[in-house]
């Protein structure tokens, strides 16, 4: 079973297996997130983060207002959240651990003149490259095997209106010794449009490419939307969801499907 429940210990918030850690408070080096598995390590910090900003664990298991059926269908401890309120002026930063993915939400609460967010990434035994699809691949330094993917970012406002994928992009700079500068850029005109409803969520996730499942949801205004690390699929009169798996486990005839 996957247990992504979080606990506080000393200056850290971490999963039980300690593979994923968050800073309880932003200190001098500004480290926010550490992912450590086997001989691979990823450390991320947000440039300009307001010092002494604290991270709070958001309880996913309480599910206030959920129906009995929703609670029954929710896998306990599969996901967990950490929120850094006002880590930048008018910006919250939220991390959601879901299954094997770490979803990062930059929550923009008010208009600004610039929507570029810079992260410093320190890698151990990994190399980073921005590929032709606009996603970032983190590969083993020796074998070249892709260990993690940072898919292309998405952005949506409080009304659920998504930005066209052409309005968001990454830039990646190798500064040496395993350190990289990652910038998440969102089009200013789209963000400042009178049609926007705040807050706006900018979503650059980190995922482990281990799943045999591919899913996609599109509508007429978001025909090229792609968010492979998003755990949800929109289905409605205007949204169409598609789901594909390349392999299925053996299911005996006597099995009950619940």
Question: Which residues make up each language-model segment?
Answer:
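Residues that cap or anchor secondary-structure elements
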Residues: 1-209
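Flexible, small-residue-rich N-terminal segments that precede or flank a structured functional core
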Residues: 201-257
């Amino acid at each position: 079973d996957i247990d992504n429940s979080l606990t506080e210990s000393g200056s850290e918030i971490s999963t039980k297996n300690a593979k994923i850690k968050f800073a309880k408070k932003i200190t001098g080096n500004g480290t926010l997130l550490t992912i450590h598995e086997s001989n691979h390590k990823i450390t991320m910090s947000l440039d300009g983060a307001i010092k002494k900003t604290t991270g709070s664990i958001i309880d996913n298991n309480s599910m206030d207002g959920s129906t009995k059926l929703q609670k029954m269908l929710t896998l306990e401890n599969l996901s967990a959240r950490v929120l850094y309120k006002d880590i930048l002026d008018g910006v919250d930063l939220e991390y959601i651990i879901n299954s094997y993915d770490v979803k990062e939400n930059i929550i923009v609460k008010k208009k600004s003149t610039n929507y570029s967010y810079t992260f410093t990434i320190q890698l151990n035994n990994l190399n980073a490259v921005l590929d032709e699809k606009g996603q970032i691949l983190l590969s083993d330094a020796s074998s070249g095997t892709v260990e993690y993917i940072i898919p292309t970012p998405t952005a949506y406002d409080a009304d659920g209106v998504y930005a066209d994928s052409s309005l968001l992009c990454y830039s990646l700079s190798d500064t040496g010794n395993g350190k990289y500068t990652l910038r998440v850029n969102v089009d200013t005109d789209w963000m400042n449009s009178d049609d926007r409803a705040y807050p706006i969520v900018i979503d650059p996730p980190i995922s482990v490419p281990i799943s045999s499942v591919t899913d996609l949801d599109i509508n007429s205004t978001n025909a090229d939307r792609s968010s492979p690390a998003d755990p949800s699929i929109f289905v409605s009169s205007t949204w169409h969801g598609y789901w594909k798996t390349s392999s299925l486990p053996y299911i005996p005839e006597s099995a009950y499907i619940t």
